[in-house]
Each structure stands twice: as structure tokens, then as C-alpha cells.
């Protein structure tokens, strides 16, 4: 894959060649640097800093979550990067190369496969763009951390499968949203 670099004036500055065939995502971390998530030749997901001056990939980080193409990376909450996967939202630490789960999409009555972007606000709320492939509807969702004891109890469907289809997951989420 080829990453083209442009300056703040919009002028082409050069390119960075990667050995990856599939880029997972890219974004700016808390440190103001831009990072690239991608598959390496062994199929593992890696994270590398983009060195704009050297026109190369910089330091590489391991144990990065697979974003399954939902790869809009942005500044983290407590750590460096907020990382969206199809099951959860994570805060990733560059120093420790570890993730901390921020939330489970299903626990928030959201089909994580439909989340195309997520970010944190300055006051700690989570904003997510949710694009429902089945209905064509797109929502901007704002999530606020709430203690489990403060959440109204309701009936929910839990489905255990080896692989869950998107339509089955969407049906369970829809039921869970509407149940009392």
C-alpha cells in the first residue's frame, strides 16, 4: 500500500510505501502524531507511527486490536488511541502496547459492525456514527457512562454461536433496544 503525504498547504510532500496489502485505519493520537494500523505479512495487525520527515514508517507497536476496517483512529481517553472494533471500543497505550476496554457495543444496544467511527469528547462521552446496512439509516449516537445499578432492568436476548451473522446480531440488538 502507498500512503501519500501532504503538507498543511495541501502540497504533495512524498509517499510512504508499506509492505501491507490491507490498511486497517489511520488517525492522530494524543501525542499529535499520525499512526497507521495494518496487517503485516504474517496476518497480524500492527500499528506504526508515520514519519513524515523521513517519509517512512516509524516505530511499530504489537498487540493492536483488529479493527476489521472500522479503522478511524483518534486520540484516546486515558491512553493514546481510541480503537473501534466490531465488538468493543478500546483505549490503547503506546507505552504498554495494551488495550483497555472502554465499552462493549452490544452492552450499549449497538451492533458494533455498524459503527463506522467513534471518538471521545472532552467531557468523556463517546460519540459514534452508526450506519445500519439493512435499513440504510445513519445515526450519530452519544453514550454516557452509567453505573450498572442505575440502568433499568429489562429482558434481553443473548445468542451463543460460533459465528454470528450480521442480520442475527442486528435482530438481537433491535429486540434489546425495544424491550422493557
PLM feature spans:
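Short alpha-helix C-terminal cap/hinge motif
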Residues: 171-180
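Residue position within the beta-strands of beta-propeller blades
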Residues: 36-38, 83, 128
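Short, well-ordered beta-strand elements
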Residues: 153-165, 180
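Blade-level signature of beta-propeller repeat domains, shared across WD40, Kelch, NHL, RCC1
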Residues: 115-151
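Short loop/turn segments that connect beta-strands within beta-propeller blades
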Residues: 6-11, 51-55, 94-97
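Repeated scaffold domains used in trafficking and secretory/extracellular systems
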Residues: 18-31, 65-78, 110-121
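Structural motif
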Residues: 2-4, 42-49, 86-93, 134-142
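A short beta-strand motif characteristic of beta-propeller blades
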Residues: 11-17, 56-64, 100-109
